[in-house]
């Protein structure tokens, strides 16, 4: 049951980061291991998406229901695929130097083989994923001012 929570202050507005995370269709363009994305349905408040993740010899697709609470929260709930469960949440709060991002992911694969494989690289994979979103923000919105940096902050506890 890999779980990861982290909080960072980043030099972008909550709306900007929300828009990047909510744009699931573009994940294959920048997110490591995301090799496909298809939006099944979308409204202003919710979307249903199929994502295909590939790492090493493994390739798995899954369906998620994504709740959009612009500009403060993106919640991902697993619907169908190789997981027993998957919960992912991004919270965006205004901060004097930009935005405080609170990120949480918790999941378990049905397959013990997949669970063991991801367990070995889980922390590195999550770090790369979060950094990919930060790089995407720089690519889309430009570099932050030289006086501002990404600052880790303590993540809040999740149930």
Which ranges hold each PLM region?
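Hydrophobic pocket/interface hotspot
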Residues: 17-21, 27, 49, 101-103, ...
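Glycine-rich portal/gate segments that line the openings of hydrophobic small-molecule binding cavities
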Residues: 38-80, 132, 136-139, 144, ...
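Hydrophobic ligand-binding cavity/cleft-lining segments
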Residues: 1-44, 97, 143, 151-159
